[in-house]
Amino acid sequence: MYNPPAAQEMSYSDHVKKRHEDKGCLYACLFTLCCCFCCYETCECCLECLCCC
């Protein structure tokens, strides 16, 4: 028998997608912008999120 796969950490983009599914696009965009504001750089995930809105 095979062992089940190990639990994986949720990536940043997966986390944003989950927020988008749970709370909606506006909340996901604000969550993403706050993250980029805190780390002082624009990441690919921010650009993808802003383009989807």
Curated annotation (Swiss-Prot):
Principal location class: membrane
Name of this chain's protein: Protein CADMIUM TOLERANCE 3
Entry keyword annotation includes Nuclease: no
Induction profile: Accumulates in roots upon aluminium (Al) exposure in an STAR3/ART1-dependent manner (at protein level). Up-regulated in shoot tissues in response to cadmium (CdCl(2)).
Gene: CDT3
Membrane topology: Single-pass membrane protein
Entry's transmembrane regions: 24-40
Keyword Transmembrane helix on entry: yes
